[in-house]
Design a protein with these regions (language model features):
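N-terminal secretory signal peptides
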Residues: 1-11
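C-terminal segment of N-terminal export signals and the immediately downstream linker at the start
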Residues: 30-62, 66-68, 75
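Shared catalytic-loop signature of beta/alpha-barrel
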Residues: 86, 93-97, 102, 109, ...
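Extended hydrophobic packing segments that form well-structured cores
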Residues: 368-400
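N-terminal export leaders
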Residues: 10-29
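Metal- or metallocofactor-binding catalytic centers and their adjacent structured scaffolds
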Residues: 71-145
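Conserved, mostly hydrophobic/aromatic
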Residues: 73, 134, 147, 211, ...
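Metal-dependent enolase-superfamily TIM-barrel catalytic cores that perform enediolate-based chemistry
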Residues: 161, 165-254
């Protein structure tokens, strides 16, 4: 037999359930009424129904421009950089099997799918350069779909301009190719002279960098680095062959000039040893070489945890530069960006401007912010790609 208190509690529960049911019915009615009057309620999620339907490739010298098409007449452009078109084209065609019919806004999923589809093919320049071009196009599509620049999809801009080089106030001295290494101080004299002249050219407030291109043996590199200390060099680039962490550590322990590398370290898995061993000061990730926007953003975040800034490497066209600019615009730790104007024979129109001080505005418009003249692009005669064949003074194979 229920007590008076239990009855009161039971009544309270019944009343509560009854009132909840009434409220639910009221909300349903309200939704029906507001749905009729509110245009926003009728808008579907376009991102859930968009599908990849096709692709096209256009060879331009050592680059292949890539177009990915969708069922919503939104397309995206990317660049497969520094691969023979005879390699890039078939690779894109082969990888398209993994993309056909997929939702292009699932960028991370598709990156993982492309990279991990065959475990024996993971990594390496051919795969990562190709994935980079595809990844750029997917971000371009997603930005256009939502009507925003790509950097808006990555947390928004952290800066309103991007410092670039080379400019009259920022100059990188090249190594000039392999040199004999006899152990003589005379071996490095021409290089030291080039750095000194560069400093005089840009002035005290300018920026001087040196690109070693892995050309100098470690003892010679150390000797050279110590000799250029008075000229306040921002960095020595690629002081050793990428991946040889022990050599990087040895050099880092022997010099005061900051060391930079990363253009050929294409993923977070290749970058992490440098950071863990504290043997470089600046990461030079290349968006077009290292898996595209998706991987570059991860490298930047990883480097941030070690307080190592990004100074992106780039020898890409405006398409590849745009992709790199969008990541650069969205990260906190940035130093300076390599930049060479390349519109692929007048077929690419950029959406930023570089001022006389070497500062670039951010890309504008939805997606990557690049207009492509596809008709003109289709008329370009592909030039035959020639494999480089560098040699040391004695005829042996050189890295640069």
């Amino acid at each position: 037999m229920m007590s008076d208190q239990s009855k009161r509690q039971g009544m309270s529960r019944r009343e509560l359930l009854a009132s909840a049911g009434t409220a639910a019915a009221g909300m349903l009615l309200l939704n029906e009424v507001s749905g009729a009057d509110n245009p926003a309620a009728k808008v579907g999620d376009r991102a859930s129904s968009i599908k990849i339907t096709g692709f096209k490739t256009y060879p331009v010298g050592s680059k292949t421009l890539l177009k990915i098409e969708t069922n919503q007449q939104i397309f995206g452009w990317g660049e497969v950089s520094q691969l023979p078109p005879t390699v890039a084209g078939p690779l894109v065609q082969s990888m398209f099997e993994l993309l056909d019919g997929e939702n292009p806004t699932r960028i991370e999923h598709l990156w993982q799918k492309l990279y991990r589809a065959h475990r024996d093919y993971r990594g390496g320049a051919f795969m990562l350069h190709t994935i980079a071009g595809i990844d750029m196009a997917l971000w371009d599509i997603t930005g256009k779909l939502h009507g925003v620049p790509v950097y808006r999809l990555m947390g928004g801009p952290t800066r309103d301009r991007i410092r670039v080089y080379p400019t009259p106030k920022a100059y990188k001295v090249p190594a000039g190719g392999p040199r004999p290494a006899s152990g003589n101080p005379a071996d490095i004299e021409p290089l030291v002279k080039s750095v000194k002249e560069a400093r005089e050219r840009v002035g005290k407030d300018g920026t001087v960098m040196f690109d070693a291109h892995c050309c100098l043996p470690p003892p010679m590199l150390i000797q050279f680095a110590n000799a250029i200390e008075p000229y306040d060099v921002l960095w020595i680039e690629e002081p050793a062959v990428p991946g040889n962490i022990e050599v990087f550590k040895r050099i880092k322990q022997s010099v005061k000039v900051p060391l930079a590398s990363g253009e050929r370290d294409r993923t977070i898995w290749e970058v992490i040893p440098y950071l863990q061993e504290r043997c470089i000061d600046i990461i030079q990730h290349d968006c077009a070489h290292g898996g595209g926007i998706t991987q570059m953003k991860k490298v930047a975040v990883l480097a941030e945890t070690y307080t190592v800034p990004l100074a992106p490497h780039s020898i890409a066209s405006f398409l590849g530069i745009a992709a790199s600019f969008h990541v650069t615009a969205s990260i906190p730790l940035f130093l300076i960006h390599e930049y060479y104007a390349n519109d692929c024979g007048g077929t690419l129109k950029k959406s930023w401007e570089v001022d006389k001080n070497g500062d670039s505005s951010l890309p504008q418009g939805p997606g990557l912010g690049i207009e492509v003249d596809e008709a003109a692009l289709a008329k370009i005669d592909p030039t035959k790609f020639k494999w480089p064949g560098q040699k040391n003074p004695d005829g042996s194979v050189a890295d640069y």
